[in-house]
């Protein structure tokens, strides 16, 4: 099986986090998002322990909210001692409404509105991660009006190609995010920020991309970022104390994907950071990273019911399910690979394209999936590793209600997000 929280009973029925998924589908309906809470907590603890073991005082992993944002997720993050990053006032509101400590929240985004800035300042969040000149000036004005000094990091682009999907590659010079080190724009913004009396520039942020497997990507990022910290000290006399390398560690979506030893990677990264800062005479910074996918992806599974099977002789076979791009748009966006299991049959395998119910030819969950040849209407299919960027990217296209999110623990099963109703679909209509 793809992950050790997935198994089969002696009768061949698929289990997830120890539970029979066919029974979960029967009780809660489909499509259905399942989340293994124990796995989420274990992934948090893995990061937290590695940070305690290898990085300096105050260093902290921040959960990247965009991976999966709902109130119970923030409660778990708070209980485990994580920080979080948010990229909108909506994510910030959700975190605060769940009781997440404001001082452990970092507000990202390349186009924060005046309302975003005012809301974050009014709530006393820990840091804004400033992206551009206009934001710096607007945030200075907002902080001055509130008579506070707001801590910030400055987002810069180090010019690193992580060799991942183009749509999730964010650290190259021409990225829409941050200011480029190579062009001198990052240094200009550092100098501007240091002149603004109501902003307290504490450090730098960068993020090179998502689903990163290469061993040297973060070391190459440090090759840019640490000398840039040294250049800032040389040109301004200021030693910035925080360095945030963003997120991006890859996860296994298929058997072909590498299984990354994240604690070992973090130990190597910490050693390299120590070596580079000592070489340039800099103190070891307070270190931050922003894991999202590697916290929640393998804690998720989505269940579907097959609605029809269509065979086109000489061409292909389709298994159409009761969800699709509305609950998982990632294949439609960038052809993301997934592992799909039949939940309760194990006969002779045939190749099917698993497709959704939306009125789009591109509504594909996964092409070329090997399923039992007798797959038919009413069968349950399970898509693995859907904990990240499925619920959070879901939509109501074709007026389809979004699925429930059901949390699984060793002692209980509970809904974290209820299934939407038709009344919800029209609840905002006038």
Show which residues each predicted segment covers.
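Structural preference for beta-strand elements that scaffold enzyme active sites
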Residues: 60-62, 81-83, 102-106, 127, ...
